[in-house]
Swiss-Prot record:
The lineage of its organism: Eukaryota, Fungi, Dikarya, Ascomycota, Pezizomycotina. It is a multi-pass membrane protein. Keywords: Glycoprotein, Membrane, Repeat, Transmembrane, Transmembrane helix, Transport. Its main location: membrane. The chain crosses the membrane at residues 53-73, 88-108, 136-156, 176-196, 203-223, 245-265. It is found in: Membrane. This is Probable aquaporin-3. InterPro entries: Aquaporin-like, Aquaporin_transptr, MIP. The gene is FgAQP3. GO terms for molecular function: water channel activity. Residues 74-87, 157-175, 224-244 are extracellular. It comes from Gibberella zeae (strain ATCC MYA-4620 / CBS 123657 / FGSC 9075 / NRRL 31084 / PH-1).
Amino acid sequence: MADTYGMNGHNGHVKDRRSSSMNGRNRLYAQQEPQRTTHLSEFGKHMVAASGEFVGTFLFLYFGYAGNIVAVLQEPISGPNGTLANNTVMYIAMAYGFSLLVNVWTFYRISGGLFNPAVTFGLCLSGQLPWIRALFLFPSQIIAAMCAGGLVNAMFPGSASIANTTLGPNTSIAQGVFLEMFFTAQLVFVVLMLAAEKSRDTFLAPVGIGLALFVALIPGVFVTGGSANPVRSFGCAVGSRDFPGYHWIYWVGPLLGAALAAGYFRLVKMMHYEEANPGQDSPVDV
C-alpha cells in the first residue's frame, strides 16, 4: 500500500514519465487534427451564394413557367366563366411545387435555396439570415426571374403572359392581398420550421417546402393566379411585357405573409415551444 504512488520504489517517476508521454502524445494529436481552411472572404461567400440563388431561381421559375404554359395550351376544355379546369389547376400547382422541391434540394447547400424575396425577408425578420446576405440574394432572385420569363417567352409557343398571375372571377384586390398573404405565410413557416430550425427532419425540408407550395397553389391558381412569390409574378410579366394594374399585390401580400410567419416563429421560440411537446427529436427506437 505504501508503494501505491511510488510505482514500486521509483518514487512516481514512471508515472510522471508516462503522464508526460501521454500529454506530449495528446499535443501531437491536437497538432495533427485537420484545420478547417477558408478559401473565401466574406464578400466571396456572399457572391457564391448569390450565384447559386440566381441559377436556382432561374431553373425553378423556368420549369414552373414552362409547365404552366404547357398545361394551359394543352387543355381544350375550360371551367365555368372561362376559368381553368380542375386538372389544369392541379398540373400548374404540381409544376411549381415540384420544380421548387427539386431545385431547393439541389441548391440549399450553396445559397440556402430560397428563390423567393418573401422567404428571404421572412428569414431575416426571424433572425435566421443576416440582412447583408439578403442584399446579395434579392437582386439575384429578381434578375433570375426576368431571365426565366424572357427565355420562356422566346422559346415556348404562345406567350409568357399565359403564366401571368391574375385575379380570378369575383376576387377583389383586397381579397387578393390577404389571400397571397396567407398562401405565403404557409410557405414561409414551413421553411422556418423544417429548414431554419434544425431537427432530425431537416434533411427532408425540400420535400416539405415543395409540398407547401403545391398545397398553397391548389386554391391559389384559381383565386389569385397562385404566386406566393413576388418574383414568380414579376418574371413572366417582364418576359411578356404585360403587367396587370394590380401587380403590386403580388409584392405586398407575400411580404406581409412572410412577416406574419416570422412573427409567429419568434413567438413560439420565445415561449420555448420545444417543451410543449417534448421528445419529437428523440431516436425512434427510444
